[in-house]
Amino acid sequence: MSQILFKTKTFWYGIALTFCIATLSYFLAKLPFLMILGQLVTAILIGIIIRALFPVPDKWFTGIQFSNKVILRAGIILLGFRLNLVDIYHAGWRVFLIAALCLSFGITIVYFLAKLFGVDKKLAILVACGTGICGAAAVVAISPQVKADNNQTAVAATIIALLGTIFTVIYTLIYPILPLGPDGYGIFAGATLHEIAHVIAAADPGGSSAVDMAVIVKLTRVALLVPVCFVVAKMVNAGTKNRFSWAELPVPWFIFGFLATSAINSFGIIPTSVTDFLVICAYFLIAMSMGGLGLNVHLPSFGKMGGKPFAAALIGSVFLSVFGLALVLLFHLAG
């Protein structure tokens, strides 16, 4: 009984740590030199700094992972109360095409570079899918399809978490000089950044319309996780005795929750004052997940894993950013 209680306590300690990070980031983001980054990016950076400077107990990571995954999805579902489904219709087919093209390009270029650098095939697939689809969630989903071991999965997830954080900060800083309006910037961020959390954090300086568009585009990429898993599993298992299982395919159910809250908001069922409060709660929950994301970045581990997969993902992410920006401009969606 005491062991169960102890585990329960450490679980809540992890959640409490992300709660404190979210609270601290809320106030720090009001400072002039951090205002440009915003609360969400600040939360990521606080998490990274805490992990680098202080020994975070391993047992706390159960709660931290809960914040990083479950609380993030709860925040995204609540964020739907700010979106009107009419906005999705107005986004048009070009937006969804950009999402699909960037996903395909991201996976292809990173995998090609990883193999060029001599990275193990399984690790190359994990890093490529993490870059092209939805970050660490894609890494974890693809891992059983390619029969990757725990070390390969952890390495790929760490690479994506760190790269996504770096690019989130860069996007936030260069937004004022990009030839993009809020909607165009949201499409660009949603089509090219790694994690859903990264997308929301990077789009936040562009305002509500940028975040809404970014979430729509990013969730389009997330929705494609299932067919990508299917294709990867069939390709990897071709010519082997391994049997494909539909039960192993991951389904991102939280997307339906996001669409449901968006529909409720579109019909005006809930008063604006209530939805405004729910959106504030959504941002706080997402900030908690940002803190968890930062806490998962273990900088010393990069000295052990080698730089090849990181270099492949870094160069591939740069190409993906340029490709995504070019598509937004080509399809005349910069505004």
Swiss-Prot record:
Any one annotated GO CC term: plasma membrane
Key word Cell membrane present: yes
Keywords tagged on the record: Cell membrane, Membrane, Transmembrane, Transmembrane helix
Keyword RNA-binding: no
A Pfam family the protein falls into: Cons_hypoth698
Major localisation: membrane
Protein name: UPF0324 membrane protein lmo2147
